Amino acid sequence: MATGKIVQIIGAVVDVEFPQSNVPSVYDALNVTDSKERLVLEVQQQLGGGVVRCIVMGSSDGLRRGVEVVNTGAPISVPVGTKTLGRIMNVLGDAIDERGEVGAEEVYSIHRSAPSYEEQSNEIALLETGVKVIDLICPFAKGGKIGLFGGAGVGKTVNMMELINNIALQHSGLSVFAGVGERTREGNDFYYEMQEAGVVNVEKPEESKVAMVYGQMNEPPGNRLRVALTGLTMAERFRDEGRDVLLFIDNIYRYTLAGTEVSALLGRMPSAVGYQPTLAEEMGVLQERITSTKSGSITSVQAVYVPADDLTDPSPATTFAHLDATVVLNRNIAAMGLYPAIDPLDSTSRMLDPLVVGQDHYEVARGVQQTLQRYKELKDIIAILGMDELSEEDKQVVSRARKIERFLTQPYHVAEVFTGDPGIYVPLKETLRGFKGLLAGEYDDIPEQAFMYCGSIDDAIENAKKL
């Protein structure tokens, strides 16, 4: 194995000089020899003269020029298979849960090519989530890519936790959770919540259903840039075994941000809004690998932070292109105290097609959107002239729209500790029955507050009796 010496250190970027005859390839992993903990460098550029520029997969504190570095001759490889279940790992696949080595029989390189056209599956099946607004307006595809878009503090992580709770527990398949540049506290909470739910079994790890890979906010940009690929590699292995896997990534924006930091350190010219010039390519490399094959499926749910609530920002805009369903969280809905704060007029899904969901579902969903859109248009008139100036027909639209807005709320299992209300899983059949009745005027006599935070329409009728 070729050895080289560190010649320059600029934060998370390190230059290493090798003999001209033994220069490492791009993406090769290099091991730093005299580091107390395992420290890996990943080659990003060949500068000529035997010098390669690398990003550090860890802290560069204490590194100095002249330190010896060994080329492994292969990209970073991480453990895969059932031994990863119930464990928390870092970007290199090393266990960070203080429960010993992962001890997997097999390792995969984190840099792999996407499945070919022949291998990809084109089956269409719906994935029920138990969340009314999602199942009605933006239904998820099994094996599809779903994005949760929202600014700071509107509920991306809570919605993702609820989806993990509803889908992973109901679906009883395997899941991989990649925490990319998020808060350590959230990762810690998630781990203990999964233990309480029985998804992680510490005594019998083989009975666990989820593998966790974390690269938190305090980690260097190299870790945050590669941790999504580590999680995806583990999910790909389960898929190739013929399983249906759920891949949760929180947050895809931090992946882009880490790429921006690394790009600047590597000396690349920034593009729009300071993002890296390779933004679309980096996003494509990750997203194209998240796909279903004829052997198994990967259904991915990705939280996407929207900077300053601007959906036209290059990072969320680049992510949009790859998704099958987009769930947009709206700050104005959250400000009204209506949770989940999902915007039914902005959220979309390619599955909302009469040929996929059926004519009945399609008409109910479009009817709900039309009613809410009309109410939105009438809000200005109401603000200036008041309700009395509206026609009888418009008054009815407003009344129904306000009931629909409230009926789209529901208590979450994961929020029970904050709200005190037990969570409710609402089957799609019940969701459609409730909204169909609302549009037809069957519940015009029920006061709107009865619809707040209820499950099925029967709960709303019960609430009305108590008012």
Swiss-Prot record:
As its record notes, the protein acts as a catalyst of:
ATP + H2O + 4 H(+)(in) = ADP + phosphate + 5 H(+)(out)
User: Where does it reside?
Assistant: Cell inner membrane
- Top enzyme class, one word, equals translocase
> What CDD domains does its record include?
ATP-synt_F1_beta_C, ATP-synt_F1_beta_N, F1-ATPase_beta_CD
Membrane topology (UniProt): Peripheral membrane protein
Question: What SMART domains does the record tag this protein with?
Answer: AAA (SM00382)
Provide the residue positions that the database annotates as binding ATP. Answer: G150, G151, A152, G153, V154, G155, K156, T157
Query: Which Pfam families does the record cross-reference, listed alphabetically?
Result: ATP-synt_ab, ATP-synt_ab_N, ATP-synt_VA_C
Family the entry assigns: Belongs to the ATPase alpha/beta chains family.
Quote the protein name from its UniProt record.
ATP synthase subunit beta
